[in-house]
């Protein structure tokens, strides 16, 4: 008998105090419009915000939905899932819910054995939309643009880990091609637009 669904914002265990967009999504999951969906109508949606609270309530959790606004490579989600498992919650109880996901991130999460649900699935902006030879030219062009705007870290030339995302939200993910978000460095830290 399932009377409660637990939701948890995807977060990094090392930076848990950092405000993440998953917190905002969790807030909406508790609202009236969401409760009108038949799957949630007779369920209590319980928000858990910290890893220590997850551990404290692990025996009550039958379904845990990890939420975020965007999944890029899947690295953050997999790290969060691993931390959740360390707190005693098995992955067969875990699902990921996101607004937008890169296909590569979706595959990474599913490859680990955790279902992921997204409103929008995005392919790589260049590699998945052009023939190989044309894509290679466009990738080199994007790398030149990244150098011109002084993106110092080569692993960001095509977005984090070459995600080639074309996604912007309140805070543009670094998976997005850098000319959308890169503002250079200040005091040794990457500045985001």
Identify the function of each model-found stretch.
Residues 1-3, 55-60, 89-90:
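Flexible, charged surface loops at secondary-structure boundaries
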Residues 18-63, 72-79:
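Short, glycine/charge-rich flexible loops or terminal/linker lids adjacent to PRPP-binding catalytic cores
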Residues 3-28, 32, 79-193:
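PRPP-dependent phosphoribosyltransferase catalytic core
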Residues 66-67:
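Generic enzyme active-site microenvironment
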């Amino acid at each position: 008998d399932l009377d409660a669904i637990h939701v948890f914002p995807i977060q990094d265990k090392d930076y848990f105090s950092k405000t993440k967009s998953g917190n905002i999504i969790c807030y909406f999951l508790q609202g009236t419009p969401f409760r009108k969906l038949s799957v949630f109508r007779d369920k209590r949606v319980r928000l858990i915000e910290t890893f220590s609270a997850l551990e404290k309530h692990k025996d009550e959790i039958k379904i845990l939905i990890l939420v975020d606004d965007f999944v890029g490579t899947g690295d953050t989600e997999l790290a969060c899932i691993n931390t959740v498992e360390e707190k005693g919650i098995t992955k067969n109880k875990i699902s990921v819910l996101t607004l937008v996901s890169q296909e590569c991130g979706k595959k990474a999460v599913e490859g680990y054995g955790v279902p992921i649900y997204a409103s929008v699935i995005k392919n790589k902006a260049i590699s998945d939309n052009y023939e190989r030879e044309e894509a290679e030219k466009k990738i080199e062009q994007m790398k030149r643009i990244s150098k011109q705007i002084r993106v110092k870290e080569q692993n960001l030339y095509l977005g984090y880990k070459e995600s080639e995302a074309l996604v912007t939200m309140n805070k543009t993910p670094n998976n997005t091609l850098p000319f959308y978000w890169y503002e250079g460095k200040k005091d040794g830290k990457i500045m985001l637009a």
